[in-house]
Amino acid sequence: MPLPQPHDLTTLVLRTDFGDDAAWEALCAALDGADAYPCATPVSDPRFAGAGIQALLAEESAAGEDERICEVFLADATALAGPEHPLLAVDLFTEPGRTFRVPVRWYPEISANLSIANMDFAEYADAAGPSGTFRGFGDD
C-alpha cells in the first residue's frame, strides 16, 4: 500500500510513535503555527506505528509511479520528545533512505522548497550540522 499523498504544496508528516498523544497534538500545533500557510499534511495512522525507514521505502517502491512521493517527514519518538520537535526527513526518491533532522522552525521553508522543486533534498541534507540536524544555511 502506498504512503498517503500530501495535500497540494505540502509535504507528508507521518506519525510513527504512538506513545504520547499530547506530544503529537503539540507537534501538529507547532506545525500549524510555524507559517501563515499550511505546509504539512499530518497523518496519524496506527499502521505506521514503529515503521522504520526500510519499511517505508519498501511501501513506496511498491506504489504506482503516479502514487509515489519524494520525501516524508517522520514524527518519531525523538521528534515527539524534543521541544524543537526535530522531524526525521527521509528521502524516498533520489537517494532513498538518506535522512536528516529538521526542527519545526525550519520545516515550512523546507516543505515549500521541496514541494515546488525549488531546492532538492540533498541541498538540505548537505547543510545539516554534525549532529545531522538542519538549522538553516548559516545566514538564517
Roles of regions detected by a PLM:
Residues 132-140:
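Short linear, low-complexity motifs centered on an aromatic residue
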Residues 1-122:
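Short helix/strand-capping turn motifs
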